[in-house]
Each structure stands twice: as structure tokens, then as C-alpha cells.
Amino acid sequence: MFSKLEAIIRPFKLEEVKVRLMTFGVPGITVTNVMGCGKQIGGIERSKGVEYDSELIEKVKIEIVVMNEHIDELIEIIINAVWTGEIGDGKIFVSPVSSVIRIRTQDKDLDAI
């Protein structure tokens, strides 16, 4: 019935993804600053004028829970917003969600989305 879509993307692509998701009608998103590495290994970073080696790269994680019927469209929206063809474009993970509960009202599933 529901799936959770997690997209790890470059931070500067967040605004474009957010606008496209909201235009599609996604009712809400969770955004978290994360760090990680994969094929795109870190390099020289600067902070307050000091250079240092960084094995982890700053990314942004977007999480949304939607009805399964919308997953393919949302994946396409995200890919179209962030794709450069370069290492580091990110990853999308899709997981099943068995139930959703809004704490304030105790609404469940579709009423809680």
C-alpha cells in the first residue's frame, strides 16, 4: 500500500527536488543532512580557512512516504532533477511501509499521509 522513498543527493540539488515533489503533490518530506561515501571518495575540504582530507562527503537525504502507485513517477522526478551523469549523483532506496500513524490525531495509513 505504501512505500518509503529515500534519496541521497547533492545538497545544492535539494531546492529543485523539493519544488518538483511539491508540484507533483507530495504532502510532505523529511530532509536530513548526512555524510557518506561510495564510489565518490572525499577529497580536500576547507573549513574556516583550514584544509583537511575528508573521506566522507556531505549529502542530503530526502525521505517521503507515498502510495505505491506513485513510486515510479517520483523516482523519475528525482532522477530528472539531480542527474548529471557524474559519480556522486546519489542513490534512491525504496522500502515497504506497513503502516503510517499521525501521532497528534492517531489517524492511520492514508488519513495519516
Swiss-Prot record:
By its UniProt entry, which InterPro entries does this protein fall under?
Answer: N-reg_PII, N-reg_PII-like_a/b, N-reg_PII/ATP_PRibTrfase_C, N-reg_PII_CS
Q: Which domain of life is it from?
A: Eukaryota
| One Pfam family hit | P-II
| UniProt KW Chloroplast keyword | yes
Keyword DNA damage present in the record's keywords: the answer is no
Please cite one Gene Ontology biological process associated with this protein.
regulation of nitrogen utilization
Q: Which residues carry this modification: O-UMP-tyrosine?
A: Y52
- This protein's major location comes to plastid
Question: Keywords for this entry?
Answer: Chloroplast, Nucleotide-binding, Phosphoprotein, Plastid, Transcription, Transcription regulation
User: What GO molecular function annotations does the UniProt record carry, in alphabetical order?
Assistant: ATP binding; enzyme regulator activity
Location in the cell: Plastid, Chloroplast
Q: Give the CC-aspect GO terms.
A: chloroplast; cytosol
Q: Which PANTHER family does the annotation name? A: NITROGEN REGULATORY PROTEIN P-II, NITROGEN REGULATORY PROTEIN P-II HOMOLOG
Q: Belongs to which family?
A: Belongs to the P(II) protein family.
The entry describes its oligomerization and partners as:
Homotrimer.
Q: What does this protein do?
A: P-II indirectly controls the transcription of the glutamine synthetase gene (glnA). P-II prevents NR-II-catalyzed conversion of NR-I to NR-I-phosphate, the transcriptional activator of glnA. When P-II is uridylylated to P-II-UMP, these events are reversed. When the ratio of Gln to 2-ketoglutarate decreases, P-II is uridylylated to P-II-UMP, which causes the deadenylation of glutamine synthetase, so activating the enzyme.
Q: Which protein are we looking at? A: Nitrogen regulatory protein P-II
